[in-house]
Amino acid sequence: MSEPQGQELRAECPVCWNPFNNTFHTPKVLDCCHSFCVECLAHLSLVTPARRRLLCPLCRQPTVLASGQPVTDLPTDTAMLTLLRLEPHHVILEGHQLCLKDQPKSRYFLRQPRVYTLDLGAEPGSQTGLPQDTAPDTRPVPIPSHYSLRECVRNPHFRIFAYLMAVILSVTLLLIFSIFWTKQFFWGMG
């Protein structure tokens, strides 16, 4: 009985206790063979004074990163993903954000890929409020162009919705017509 509970514990990041997945909690392996989620390692790499060296949160063994190598390039714990029946996604670290680009499953859909980002917080030593010389970003919302409306029509979810609405409207009109026709037919005969 304690064995399945041990597997559950191993399927979680030992730092944040979130279950591993194939997005921002992808298990990454350090040189000491301990696995942590990429979000915790990214936080750790951003607050560590020596950015090229990560100390394992459990055993304190250092993992040396190559010059310019982000923590997202550490090896993924594929055994853990196999145990969870997940396929790995490529997560990248850009500045203080983790980015995940969701690739469409089929090349037949003309949907743009979605990009998910996770903000890891402000830089160490920066102020929490807005600086006085910068105003908040107030860009106007762009009006949808003809091209974006055309892309909306190509969206398979929109097409299914439009077909369903057309079928529902047709069936409703057919029912209304048949009810009035039968009333007129039976009352006209009598």
UniProtKB/Swiss-Prot annotation:
Entry's EC annotation: 2.3.2.27
Functional pathway: Protein modification; protein ubiquitination
Subcellular compartments: Endoplasmic reticulum membrane; Endoplasmic reticulum; Golgi apparatus, cis-Golgi network membrane; Lysosome membrane
Disulfide bonds: none
Annotated PROSITE patterns: ZF_RING_1, ZF_RING_2
One Gene Ontology term, aspect cellular component: endoplasmic reticulum membrane
Keywords on record: Apoptosis, Endoplasmic reticulum, Golgi apparatus, Lysosome, Membrane, Metal-binding, Transferase, Transmembrane, Transmembrane helix, Ubl conjugation, Ubl conjugation pathway, Zinc, Zinc-finger
Tissue-level expression: Highly expressed in the kidney and testis.
Signal peptide coordinates: none
GO molecular function: ubiquitin protein ligase activity; zinc ion binding
Stretches in topological domain Lumenal: 181-190
Modifications made to the protein after synthesis: Autoubiquitinated (in vitro).
Subunit: Interacts with FATE1. Interacts with SEC16A. Interacts with BCL2L1.
Function: Acts as an E3 ubiquitin ligase catalyzing the covalent attachment of ubiquitin moieties onto substrate proteins. Triggers apoptosis in response to prolonged ER stress by mediating the polyubiquitination and subsequent proteasomal degradation of BCL2L1. May collaborate with FATE1 to restrain BIK protein levels thus regulating apoptotic signaling.
Listed name of the protein: E3 ubiquitin-protein ligase RNF183
Biological source species: Mus musculus
